[in-house]
């Protein structure tokens, strides 16, 4: 629950702060950028998130940082959906940083945040289910090599030694 609170507070702080909010790329009228941008922003957001998350996650696995940031999440060696957002507060701050990146790099509508967060929660819960929804052999397909599946993530939790 603390993680979700941090995920809500940090973007709101940047948006609502009188000295910071006016400098964000947040917009309120879809007509300002049009429907093409509204829908086209999502692939960009997911690509930005994947890049950000990959490097942040690798950094948190560094031996000098792991115990401070990421150990709490890895205490779940056979993760369940409840582990999806079981983070140390410092890790939660790092994870929510992508929302701050969005706020200062691309035009972003409040619905972008809502839809992106909803889809992220769904995929993160799936990633911690411990059972697979993709077909057998998917990990050998070219696309499967680029997608972190639930089983792959479960093995990451089970076999990683910090």
Where are these regions (language model features)?
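Non-catalytic, topology-defining segments of multipass membrane proteins
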Residues: 1-71, 75-103
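Cytosolic/stromal cytosol-facing helical appendages immediately following the last transmembrane segment
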Residues: 63-162
């Amino acid at each position: 629950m603390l993680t979700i609170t941090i995920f809500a507070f940090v973007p709101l702080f940047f948006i609502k702060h009188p000295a910071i909010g006016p400098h964000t790329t947040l917009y309120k009228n879809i007509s300002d950028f049009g429907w093409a941008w509204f829908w086209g922003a999502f692939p960009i957001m997911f690509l930005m998130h994947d890049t950000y998350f990959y490097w942040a996650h690798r950094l948190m696995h560094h031996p000098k940082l792991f115990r401070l940031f990421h150990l709490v999440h890895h205490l779940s060696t056979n993760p369940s959906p409840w582990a999806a957002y079981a983070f140390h507060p410092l890790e939660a701050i790092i994870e929510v940083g992508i929302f701050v990146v969005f706020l200062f790099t691309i035009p972003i509508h409040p619905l972008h945040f809502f839809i992106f967060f909803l889809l992220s929660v769904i995929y993160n819960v799936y990633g911690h289910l411990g059972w697979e929804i993709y077909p057998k052999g998917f990990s050998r397909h070219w696309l499967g090599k680029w997608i972190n599946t639930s089983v792959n993530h479960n093995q990451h939790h089970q076999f990683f030694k910090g």
